[in-house]
């Protein structure tokens, strides 16, 4: 069980997945969304994902490069107490996040 007051979401989805379903499932628990495009030819466009998120009334910004999305989300989390970042939408993005976190020396 995690006890954070605010959650940000880094979201990158492959085009054949249910992006709207993922957004609808996570929207009630996130404060901010950073959309991105995983390194895959099947990746959904970060701007198109941001448009879907915006329709749900959430604060969102698009970051085509996943490392930029993760850095921006991490800075957002550091600006307040009890903030956390969730990375979701694609196993490809999860792999990129693990590799990037290791290269940056981030703790889990």
Feature roles, as predicted:
Residues 15-19, 42, 94:
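Alpha-helix N-cap/loop-to-helix initiation residues
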Residues 2-6, 54-58, 105-106:
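Short helix-capping segments at alpha-helix termini
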Residues 20-84:
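C-terminal helical cap/extension that packs against the catalytic core
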Residues 1-32:
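Nucleotide phosphate-binding/pyrophosphate-handling subdomain across enzymes
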Residues 7-9, 83-87:
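Generic beta-sheet signal
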Residues 95-108:
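Active-site-adjacent alpha-helix immediately C-terminal to a catalytic or transition-state-stabilizing loop
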Residues 90:
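Active-site-proximal loop/hinge segments that shape catalytic or ion-binding/gating pockets
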């Amino acid at each position: 069980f995690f006890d954070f007051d605010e959650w940000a979401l880094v979201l990158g989805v492959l085009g054949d997945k249910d992006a709207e379903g993922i957004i609808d499932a996570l929207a009630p628990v996130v404060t901010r969304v950073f959309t991105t495009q995983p390194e895959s030819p099947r990746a959904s466009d970060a701007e198109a994902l941001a448009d879907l998120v915006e329709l749900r009334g959430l604060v969102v910004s698009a970051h085509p490069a996943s490392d930029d999305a993760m850095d921006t989300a991490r800075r957002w989390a550091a600006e307040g107490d009890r903030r956390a970042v969730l990375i979701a939408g694609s196993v490809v993005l999860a792999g990129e996040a693990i590799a990037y976190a290791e290269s940056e020396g981030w703790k889990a």
